[in-house]
Amino acid sequence: MLIFSMLNDKRTRENRMMSEQREDLGFDPDALRAKYREERDKRVREDANEQYIEVKGDFSHYIDDPYLDAALEREPLTDEVDVVVIGGGFGGLLSAARLREAGVERLRVIEKGGDFGGTWYWNRYPGAACDVESYIYLPLCEELGFVPKEKYTHAPEILAHSRAIAEKYDLYSNACLQTEVTGMEWLEDESRWLITTNRNDAMKSRFVVMSNGPLNRPKLPGIEGIDSFKGHTFHTSRWDYDYTGGSSEGGLDGLKDKVVGIIGTGATAVQCVPHLGESAKQLYVFQRTPSSIDVRDNTQTDPDWAKALKPGWQKARMENFNTLVSGGLADEDLVNDGWTEIIRNLLTMVNFSEAKLNPLEIAQKLELADFQKMEDIRARAQEIVDDPSTAESLKPYYRQFCKRPCFHDGYLPTFNRPSVELIDTQGKGVDKITEKGIVANGKEYELDCLIFATGFEVGTEYTRRAGYDLIGKGGVTLSEKWQDGIKTLHGMHSRGFPNVFIIQNAQSAFTVNFPHAMDEQAKHLSYIVDQCLGSNIQTVEATAEAEDAWVQEIVKLARLGQQFQESCTPGYYNNEGKPNLRTVQNGPYGAGANAFFALIKGWREEGSMEGLELN
């Protein structure tokens, strides 16, 4: 989002106080800047993303599927289809749905889970819910004649909706569930991809859509002694209800006599900690960096409102939301929630429509608006949490978009329970894990159960996160080509890997409503596949010139926000506090999602498939 690239322009360091009036603000901007730097610096680690452990080998049980009733038995496949879609989450479902709408019949989805749903198949922890309004987050609602039950619906309904999409578009009939891709090789003589799997499949496909998902591979912290704990342990994305009891709605009765520790205080922990606090005999929450916690105010869907929706309602609502959170203007705020309020507050401070401000003054006012909002977030923690020390530890000191903002009405009150204790590590993380529990701040906390709410790999190699590599033209692998940074056209095509389409945020659109971007990419790739199938085009790939130009454009635009990311507290947005040229190149399209959507739509309408080499 371009609006945030201005928040830390170099020029804001010059004469910052030109338009600041401390007596009117209620806070000291210089003091906050110093506090933000102090909090950031204590959290920066030299090992950045290397601080995390790859979940394999002795740690592979953390990614076992706990939701399978029985393992699926089938014979290996050696057939051929027109399109293979790798991944059964929203990106894969949308790609397959749009391909079906384009008339593609010989299509197969390969999914490692036991069903469709992607992140919503795996993340069934108590309290799991979408943090973007469900009426725009759940894809293809109009196509299915469906309206979610809540403004921010919970995981069971999202998973059920995923299954309904697969049913509507007949994706189960030829799907390979409980199947992991192990490799892909381009067969030059046949113009086909050979796809191998852990079930000894060796199938061929003319086109491949890679939709592995941005948050699909759990990560573990590289804490000393992580493999020594003798109690029960699991990752939140593989919640063990056999141990905890209860369901995604809570009621974790199995923990009533258990002392539980949870490492992590990001978006997942914010949703599940209230249920753990309600059920566990004792809960210790180990925190490195607090999340910003704003009001959620979830509501049930009004049946009369749902019945009155007119054709095109979801598309209009999605586009309206994306315009507003990208800093654009609209006559009406259809979603009108915490996300759009953030941007509305920023724009109100700047008042673009009336004030004649230069870029320096705009940057200053945006920064002040951000300060004010985060002051409100910190005041909310102070107001809700009874213990002053705990309240202070729960206050985030960084710009609001340094980390994904959280919205929840039950997280902060949980720390008023006598059985819940926040263990703030002052940015250092826990010291070590022992046979009995966790050592933090020099003190050992004995536990019966240890839960990792430590998120997913984001900044690691794409092929590592995917779990397989591609061998393209001339025997070059994708990992070799991308070793110094991602190289694509529109984030989707990479030269040397014909007929492959990649659904991702990198070098593509980023919006807080991920499925919207995925759908625009799905429409784009389905158009190209349809053109190829209808015109007997055997191969399609980016030209070298178009790919180079796109990478240069990505880097140029990304530099607008680089100063902002460098000032942020460590997280997956900024390579754990170590942004570099590679992370800049691997970033999204810096002009914003709306500009990207318009760009690829215009590309399709122009009709010449510029930048692609067709054979």
Give the ranges of each region predicted by the language model.
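Glycine-rich Rossmann-fold phosphate-binding loop(s) that bind the pyrophosphate
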Residues: G87-G91, T265-G266
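Hydrophobic/aromatic ligand-binding patch that stacks against planar heteroaromatic rings
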Residues: H275
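N-terminal FAD-binding dinucleotide-binding subdomain shared by FAD-dependent oxidases/monooxygenases
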Residues: N8-K10, N15-V83, R100-D227, D242, ...
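Active-site-adjacent "gating/activation" loops or surface patches in catalytic cores
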Residues: K230-R238
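Alpha/beta-hydrolase fold nucleophile elbow
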Residues: V260
